[in-house]
Amino acid sequence: MIIHHQFDPVLISIGPLAVRWYALSYILGFILFTFLGRRRIAQGLSVFTKESLDDFLTWGILGVILGGRLGYVLFYKFSDYLAHPLDIFKVWEGGMSFHGGFLGVVIAIWLFSRKHGIGFLKLMDTVAPLVPLGLASGRIGNFINGELWGRITDINAFWAMGFPQAHYEDAEAAAHNPLWAEWLQQYGMLPRHPSQLYQFALEGICLFAVVWLFSKKPRPTGQTAALFLGGYGVFRFIAEFARQPDDYLGLLTLGLSMGQWLSVPMIVLGIVGFVRFGMKKQH
């Protein structure tokens, strides 16, 4: 079993200011978005100009942060934040939702398209290939922080990883399983899937490869965005089987996690959109 290193979440401290790994992962994601966006502009495969890309980045950042935070509040801990509404603003304590961030970016794209007279679906197609590497960067941030770890796996599995940060969850799980209790006593922690790395590979690298390569050729308007939508939903749904469900939610109907249920509409809409848009002429 590999033991997680327990990195210090703060990379650099300068007086009262602290640069955190997780914040750095977001910054890297935005840098990658800009780099890929400019490459697509140079290839003539974008509705952006260099100036409008920089302008959109501001809109996108707001969509990610506001949507991600509100999504976490609404989808995962609504009752807690309803009782303590001021805690919503304590973003330094963590708590972001991809699905909320996705909706926030969609709203930003819609507003930006109206302001600049760009077709909404064409803008969605342009943005979609630029996003997955940013998601990959975010999952590396999760891994460095030792958060969002996976479910318990076999002690002899080559991928098994112990997360010291999960000591409370390990003890709680061991109390209901004699074998896990034995492992915990012997090794001091339980073997878990490094699900952050699975999500890095699936939602980040694999999704990027699929959407980027698909969008290198002219496609019917909306089809690239639909591929991203459905592709993310499928990869997230699969990865959730290895990810530990949120302790305050657990597994929901049909034994699925909240992340899986939020991905189901993405899969359905992605498939329907991909087929319907594919019936139209290429843009």
UniProtKB/Swiss-Prot annotation:
Organism encoding this protein: Neisseria gonorrhoeae (strain ATCC 700825 / FA 1090)
Residue ranges of the TM segments: 17-37, 56-76, 92-112, 222-242, 255-275
Family the UniProt entry places it in: Belongs to the Lgt family.
Any Pfam family matching the protein: LGT
Function field: Catalyzes the transfer of the diacylglyceryl group from phosphatidylglycerol to the sulfhydryl group of the N-terminal cysteine of a prolipoprotein, the first step in the formation of mature lipoproteins.
Name of the protein: Phosphatidylglycerol--prolipoprotein diacylglyceryl transferase
Binding site for a 1,2-diacyl-sn-glycero-3-phospho-(1'-sn-glycerol): 139
Top-level division of the source organism's lineage: Bacteria
Pathway(s) this gene product operates in, as recorded in its UniProt entry: Protein modification; lipoprotein biosynthesis (diacylglyceryl transfer)
Top enzyme class: transferase
GO molecular function: phosphatidylglycerol-prolipoprotein diacylglyceryl transferase activity
Membrane topology type: Multi-pass membrane protein
Stored PANTHER family: PHOSPHATIDYLGLYCEROL--PROLIPOPROTEIN DIACYLGLYCERYL TRANSFERASE, PROLIPOPROTEIN DIACYLGLYCERYL TRANSFERASE
PROSITE patterns: LGT (PS01311)
Cellular component annotations (GO), alphabetically ordered: plasma membrane
Keyword Magnesium: no
HAMAP family per record: Lgt
GO annotation terms (biological process): lipoprotein biosynthetic process
Compartments, record wording: Cell inner membrane
Keywords: Cell inner membrane, Cell membrane, Membrane, Transferase, Transmembrane, Transmembrane helix
EC number: 2.5.1.145
